[in-house]
Amino acid sequence: LEIKVENRHRQPVVGLQEPNFYLTENKRPVNKVKFLGAASNNDFADITLIIDRSSNCQLYKNEIETAVKEVAAAMEEKGTLRVISAGAIPVTEYIGKPSGVQNFTLETLKNPVSENVSVDLALRLATNDLINAEKKRSIIMISGGNTNNYSYSKYNLAEITSYMNNNSVCFSFIQVMQNALSSEMSYIVNNTCGELYYIFRPEGLKNIINDILEIPQGVYQLSYTSSLPTN
């Protein structure tokens, strides 16, 4: 049994133990309840990178490639790395060990450059891929932050963030241009417990995975013996 505990402000509640849970079945206490652990105990995370394929991002080829490699290195060969390219239609480009992108270049992407980027579909695809992933999970988008090419034709911002939160997926953004983050991206970051990072910062991105691991989850796993008859 997996349980997500939040307060009335939808903030995760962490630090709970077995005595904090009381399980019933048909209004009767269940037998042999066992506390299996909390997601906050995980020391690694599954990460999905979304790479912006809009035309203006091609001016920042080196910065995007550096960001991909730094995030992969920060994972320290723990967890699964996924790479999705966000163009007119999102494409899953890679699933595997973080070391698999150590020679990553934009030329290896199958998705062509596009004047229209379906960000909503890319975020939906990334979230779907993480539903059955490790308990610590995050989407990281790498982009210039210019949303003139972005479209949200199928899912609005509230639907996107709600779907992420319901599946315990946080969202962070790596900015490769020195400009302010758009209001749309800021909304998603702020409503999914994520962070904004600049590729230009002196320390680089080496702490990004540790930051994700420290995000409160409020997800717990328990087991019990059912007294209901089996079919």
Predicted regions span which residues?
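Loop/turn elements at helix/coil->beta-strand transitions in domains of secreted/extracellular proteins
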Residues: E77-R82, N132-I139, N165-S172, N191-E195
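VWA/integrin I-like adhesion module and closely mimicked acidic/polar interface patches used
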Residues: S143-N191, I209-N210
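Acidic, polar low-complexity linker/tail segments
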Residues: L1-T48, R53-K61
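C-terminal "exit" segments of structured domains
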Residues: N190, Y198-N231
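Von Willebrand factor
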Residues: S40-I95, G100-I142, T147-N148, ...
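Surface-exposed acidic, glycine-flexible loop patches that form ligand/cofactor-binding
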Residues: Q11-V13, A39-S40, V71-M75, N128-E134, ...
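Extracytoplasmic/secreted envelope proteins and their assembly/folding machinery
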Residues: E18, F44, K61, E65-A72, ...
